[in-house]
Design a protein with these regions (language model features):
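Glycine-rich beta-alpha loop segments
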Residues: 1-7
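Short active-site oxyanion
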Residues: 9-14, 120-123
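Short helix-capping segments at alpha-helix termini
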Residues: 8-10, 28-29
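Conserved phosphate- and dinucleotide-binding cores of soluble alpha/beta proteins
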Residues: 19-146
């Protein structure tokens, strides 16, 4: 959904491991798409693997935009797939800012494997109004909410 919502005048380069995002970005007239990775995780539709992590580690990105599986004010960002976790960790480390996008039912939940502490995330985007009381704990932890 994020890729579909981009301004048609946006001129940018997106490095992505997401097959779905790459397809959407490719339809945009002024976006260059760089697909990273070699092995496809069928559950997440992301490319994963050591070569993907190594490629990401060589990039300096302005923004890291992540879809979330679980986000909790105490445990942080978490996932249940080890290889996806390694990709997301590398992406966060390679970026100046991190944006997490997810539906509200993913909030206040935890998966088995930690990706990042909450203080490594700058912005949270959900379908909720930014002033919704459910988002208040995330604001108190320093996240900007949209």
């Amino acid at each position: 959904e994020f890729a579909k919502s981009l301004d048609s005048n946006l001129n940018a380069t997106f490095f992505t491991c997401s097959l779905n995002a790459a397809i959407e970005f490719a339809h945009h007239p002024s976006i260059e798409v760089v697909m990273i990775g070699d092995k496809v995780s069928k559950d997440s539709m992301l490319t994963t693997g050591a070569s993907a992590v190594q490629t990401i580690e060589s990039i300096q990105a302005d923004l890291c935009i992540l879809g979330i599986n679980s986000l909790d004010t105490q445990f942080g960002l978490s996932e249940n797939d080890w290889e996806v976790v390694q990709i997301k960790k590398a992406m966060i480390k390679a970026s100046k800012k991190t944006i997490c996008i997810g539906i509200s039912e993913k909030l206040n939940s935890q998966q088995k494997i930690k990706v990042a502490n909450l203080d490594e995330i700058d912005i949270l985007i959900t379908e909720l109004d930014p002033n919704d009381p459910a988002l208040l704990p995330f604001k108190h932890k320093g996240l900007t909410i949209y």
